[in-house]
């Protein structure tokens, strides 16, 4: 059985005192181990420290200024009143021992076998100690010889000891003869077939090469055959030579690329490379040129549009003035009387609604056609009379007419009926209600319609935006004339869509009624964060259908903060 073994090793450490803690005389010193033994996996760990304690007198006369950077300073020094001090310092210990060298942890313990110190300087203390560990197993003892499972007899062992030299001599010729036999039997086994196949392959490759090459290669065929014979005679060099030549011939048999094809490929690559930068440059030029072109086009369009509008407006005004001046006062009076009679006849009818739908459109169209014919006749008859009038008389007559219209507006509160010219519709479209709303209201309220004129920027003080007015009875025939004038207006006005003509004809049928629509004005509302369609309808006292129709909304649309809505307001505008 193994006995306890003792492991011993030396420890030497130096510590340094700081300035003001120099040692003049060392009174006592001791070194005690503080060790614990624990098992960690397959090892036994000895962890702890060697605690150094002592007392000494402080050297107050000597104050060195040397700085020791490579030394370890004393951890704790406590000074006393009598000029002495106590020092305490710990040297860490960490030792690991294999587990198979420890029988029991309780048997392992550490102690200080020998201890000495040396004070080389008043600030440097050197400690020398021999540390011993007991309780370990001794591996240096002689191991017991292993007993073999089978032991040969003594006579046989003696023969083995005596025969090995003779046996070794006999084996050498046997080994050489075996090697010779292998060498003799190996060549005739496979090489003949290999040589034949290689030679046949070589001949086939050479024939193919001869067919593809010019006639000069035919002269080389006998030489190739002689080479084949020489290769068959030399067995050892035949295989590598045939392999090398076969590889070289296969490389030669591969068609070489024509120089023309290589040049074509290079030209195509160069074109591709040059095409990409050219396309990029063209894109950049287009992007650079496009802003200038768009600005020029916008500038030209902005300059042309006011000129065209001014020309069209001037043509329509001149045509109106000519038509108004060519009509005689007596003829105007007659036309007014006829219009009054027609209105009286229409008012006496039993059912105004049915007459509106059935009879009034036909009568209105007939009256309009009669008015247009009468205007043309009067123009022909009165043209000779009024051709001698000056421009001053024309302007005077026109101004007198407009003044009479303004006077009639102040006297009678009944609503007036006026037609919109294309230029007026374009100018007032921003301030007026949407066209969709006007068309729907005209279809729903088929009995009456009110056309209100919003003030332009030039005359904000003359008319109020929501004032209803009516011209005297004598102005109705003039309205008929102005309604009929667009039918014989210049070519710029006759090019309007067919839908506008149908709206104008429907408007003329409604023109002769004495009732007005209840539509008055509208407001603009900015939607807040918590507003909904129902809340806005309750706030402005309108129905949700009116709000949805006015703003072209859907039934399931949700309002967003900052959205602008048009709020219609209705009031009774009957005279």
From Swiss-Prot:
Protein's recorded name: Stage VI sporulation protein D
Taxonomic source organism: Bacillus subtilis (strain 168)
Keywords for this protein: Sporulation
Residue span of region Disordered: 159-502
Regions of compositional bias (Acidic residues) in chain numbering: 229-238, 249-264, 438-448
Signal sequence, start to end: none
Disulfide pairings: none
Record's keyword annotation contains Transcription: no
Record's compositionally biased regions (Basic and acidic residues): 200-212, 266-275, 283-302, 310-325, 449-464, 493-502
SMART domains reported in the protein's UniProt record: LysM
């Amino acid at each position: 059985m193994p006995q306890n073994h003792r492991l011993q090793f030396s420890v030497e450490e130096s510590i340094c005192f700081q300035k003001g803690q120099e040692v003049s005389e060392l009174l006592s010193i001791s070194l005690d181990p503080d060790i614990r033994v624990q098992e960690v996996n397959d090892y036994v760990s000895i962890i702890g420290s060697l605690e150094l304690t002592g007392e000494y007198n402080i050297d107050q006369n000597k104050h060195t200024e040397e700085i020791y950077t490579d030394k370890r300073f004393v951890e704790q020094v406590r000074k006393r009143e009598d000029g002495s001090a106590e020092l305490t310092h710990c040297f860490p210990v960490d030792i690991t021992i294999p587990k198979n060298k420890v029988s029991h942890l309780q048997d392992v313990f550490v102690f200080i076998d020998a201890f000495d110190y040396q004070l080389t300087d008043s600030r440097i203390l050197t400690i020398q100690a021999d540390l011993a560990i007991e309780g370990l197993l001794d591996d240096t003892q002689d191991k017991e010889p292993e007993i073999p499972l089978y032991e040969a007899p003594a006579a046989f062992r003696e023969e083995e000891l005596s025969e090995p030299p003779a046996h070794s001599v006999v084996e050498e010729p046997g080994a050489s003869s075996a090697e010779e036999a292998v060498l003799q039997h190996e060549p005739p086994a496979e090489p003949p077939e290999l040589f034949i196949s290689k030679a046949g392959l070589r001949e086939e490759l050479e024939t193919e090469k001869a067919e593809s090459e010019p006639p000069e290669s035919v002269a080389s065929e006998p030489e190739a055959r002689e080479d084949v014979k020489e290769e068959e005679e030399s067995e050892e060099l035949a295989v590598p030579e045939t392999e090398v030549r076969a590889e070289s011939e296969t490389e030669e048999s591969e068609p070489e690329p024509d120089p023309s094809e290589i040049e074509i490929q290079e030209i195509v690559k160069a074109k591709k490379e040059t095409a990409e930068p050219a396309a990029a440059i063209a894109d950049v030029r287009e992007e650079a040129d496009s802003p200038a072109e768009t600005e020029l086009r916008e500038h030209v369009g902005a300059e042309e549009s006011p000129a065209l509008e001014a020309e069209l407006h001037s043509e329509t005004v001149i045509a109106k003035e000519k038509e108004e001046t060519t009509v005689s006062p007596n003829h105007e009076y007659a036309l007014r009387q006829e219009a009054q009679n027609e209105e009286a006849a229409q008012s006496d009818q039993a059912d105004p609604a049915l007459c509106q739908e059935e009879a009034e459109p036909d009568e209105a169209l007939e009256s309009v056609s009669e008015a247009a014919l009468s205007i043309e006749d009067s123009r022909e008859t009165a043209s000779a009379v009024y051709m001698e009038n000056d421009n001053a008389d024309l302007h005077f007559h026109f101004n007198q007419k407009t003044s009479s219209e303004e006077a009639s507006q102040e006297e009678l509160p009944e609503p007036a009926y006026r037609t919109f010219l294309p230029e007026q519709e374009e100018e007032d479209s921003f301030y007026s209600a949407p066209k969709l709303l006007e068309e729907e209201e005209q279809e729903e309220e088929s009995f009456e319609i009110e056309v209100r004129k919003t003030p332009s920027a030039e005359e904000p003080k003359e008319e109020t935006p929501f004032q209803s007015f009516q011209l005297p009875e004598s102005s109705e025939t003039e309205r008929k004339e102005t309604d009929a004038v667009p039918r014989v207006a210049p070519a710029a006005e006759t090019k309007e869509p067919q839908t506008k003509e149908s709206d104008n004809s429907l408007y003329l049928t409604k023109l002769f009624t004495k009732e007005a629509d209840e539509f008055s004005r509208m407001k603009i509302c900015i939607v807040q964060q918590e507003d909904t369609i129902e809340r806005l309808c309750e706030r402005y006292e309108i129905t949700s259908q009116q709000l949805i129709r006015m703003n072209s909304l859907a039934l399931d649309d949700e309002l967003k903060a900052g959205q602008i809505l048009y709020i219609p307001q209705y009031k009774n505008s009957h005279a």
